[in-house]
Amino acid sequence: MSDIRVRFAPSPTGYLHVGGARTALFNWLLARKQGGTFILRIEDTDVERSTQESVDAILQGMEWLGLDWDEGPFYQTDNFPLYREYIQKLLDEGKAYRCYCTAEELEAKRELAMKEGRKPKYDGTCRDLTEQPADRPFVVRFRAPQDGGATSFNDLIKGTITFPNDELDDLIVQRSDGTPTYNFCVVIDDAIMKITTVIRGDDHVNNTPRQVQLYQALGFPVPQFAHVPMILGSDKARLSKRHGATSVIAYRDMGFLPEALMNYLVRLGWSHGDDEIFSRDEMVAKFDISNVGRSPSVFNPDKLLWLNAHYIKHGDPQRLADLLVPFLKMRGVDPANGGPQLAVAIKTLQERARTMLEMADSALFYYHAPESYDRTALAKFEKEHLLAVYATVAEKLSAATAVTAAEFDALFKEICAEKGWKMPQVGQPVRIALSGGTHAPGIGEIIVTLGKEETIQRIQRAREFVEKQ
C-alpha cells in the first residue's frame, strides 16, 4: 500500500446527499487508484443535531454505492479528551488565550465594524489580558499570526490560494461550554489519522487558511488540499431539495442502480476525454484529481436517467431480478409464488426500462392476468375484427410447435399473410389481451415468457370480454 491516506468526514445531521456522495467517491477513487487508505470519520461534535438515524443513513448510502472504507467509522465525540489536551497545549505555549467577551459585546463590535465599512472580525480585546476575570464564562481563541504576512496553500484543483493574515481573526477553538469547534477538531483528527490529502467541497476553502495556521502552530505536517466545486441545480442555484431528490437512498428507492449513480457523480466535475460510460474498474484506473474542473457542475436528472437505462439494458438479468423483487412485493407480487422466472421476464423488459420502478410496473402483467383492458386502444378496431384475430391466434397457437420468440414472430407473419392483415392489426389486439395495454415487449417475447398455455387462456378471456361489449 502507498502512504496516501484520505478521508470522508460527513456530519450526521441528515442523509447522505449527492454532493457528499461525490466527495466520498473522489476520495475513494484516489485511495483505490494509489493503493492508499480510505477512512470514514463521523463528525458528530454538533451534539444537538447529530442523530444515530443520520449515521445509519450515511453508512447505508455508502454501502449501497459500494464505497467500502478501510478504517472507521471513527466518531469525533470519542476524541473530546484528546482535543482538550491540544487546546491546553496551545494555551500553555501562548498560542491560544481565553476570551471573556460576551455575545452582546461581540455583536456591538460587529455592528460598529459594519457601520464604519470594515470587515467584521474580532478585535483582540482579550488577546493580551494580564489578569483573568474570575467566575466569568470564556471561550478559547487561537492566537492567529498578526505579522502582516499571508497564509497560502496549494490546492490540487484551484492552484495556489493566499489569504492575507490581517483578514483572519482569532478563531474560537473551544466554546464556553467546553466543547471544541469544528475547525479545531478537524485539524487534530486529520493530523492524528495522518491524512495526506483532504478532498472536500469548496465551501471549505475559507476554513483552510485557519486550519493551516493551526497545523503549523501545533507542529503537524500540513496535508494537501483539493476543493471540489459545488453541484448546482438547473437554475444555477446550489443543489437542494427543491431541485428534486438529493438523497442517495432516495435514488435507490426510485429504482436507480448504484453503478449508474456512481458513473453520473464521477462525471460531475471530472472528465476523461469525451468518455461518458465508466465501469467501477475504469473509474479507478482513469481517475486523476488534477482532471477535476474548477467550475461548478449542473445536476441533470435526464442524464442520470439515461445512464440508468444504459446500465439496466446491459445488466445481468439475474442480478436485476434480485433487485426487482422488493419493488414487485411493494406492488403485491411475489415472483416466488408462481409465474415466469423473473430473470426470464426481465430479459424482455431491459430494453425499455429506465428505472427499476418502471421495470416493476412493466413486469406486473406477467404475474397478474389483466383484469381490465385499454378500451381506447381496443376501440380502434372493429368488434368483428378483434373476435376474428383472437379466434385465429388461439387456434394457430394451439397447433404451433414454435418455442422461440423468433418462431412465434414468424407465426404471426404467417397469420397476417394468410388473412391479409397488417402486423399492427394483429399485434396490438394480442398485446392488449396479454398485458392489458399497448406498452409491452414484443409478442414473441411475451408468449415465450408466459408460456403457450397461459397465452391462449388470456386471449380467450379477452375474446370473451369483447363479445360482451
Curated annotation (Swiss-Prot):
BP GO terms, sorted: glutamyl-tRNA aminoacylation
Entry-linked PROSITE patterns: AA_TRNA_LIGASE_I (PS00178)
Residues spanned by motif 'KMSKS' region: 238-242
Segments carrying motif 'HIGH' region: 10-20
Cofactor(s) needed by this chain: Zn(2+)
Note describing how the cofactor binds: Binds 1 zinc ion per subunit.
Subcellular location: Cytoplasm
Binding site for ATP: K241
One CC-aspect GO term: cytosol
Residues binding Zn(2+), per UniProt: C99, C101, C126, D128
Keywords: Aminoacyl-tRNA synthetase, ATP-binding, Cytoplasm, Ligase, Metal-binding, Nucleotide-binding, Protein biosynthesis, Zinc
Catalytic activity: tRNA(Glu) + L-glutamate + ATP = L-glutamyl-tRNA(Glu) + AMP + diphosphate
Source domain of life: Bacteria
GO molecular function: ATP binding; glutamate-tRNA ligase activity; tRNA binding; zinc ion binding
EC number: 6.1.1.17
Subunit structure: Monomer.
Biological function: Catalyzes the attachment of glutamate to tRNA(Glu) in a two-step reaction: glutamate is first activated by ATP to form Glu-AMP and then transferred to the acceptor end of tRNA(Glu).
Family: Belongs to the class-I aminoacyl-tRNA synthetase family. Glutamate--tRNA ligase type 1 subfamily.
Record-given protein name: Glutamate--tRNA ligase
Organism annotation: Pelobacter propionicus (strain DSM 2379 / NBRC 103807 / OttBd1)
Source organism phylogeny: Bacteria, Pseudomonadati, Thermodesulfobacteriota, Desulfuromonadia, Desulfuromonadales
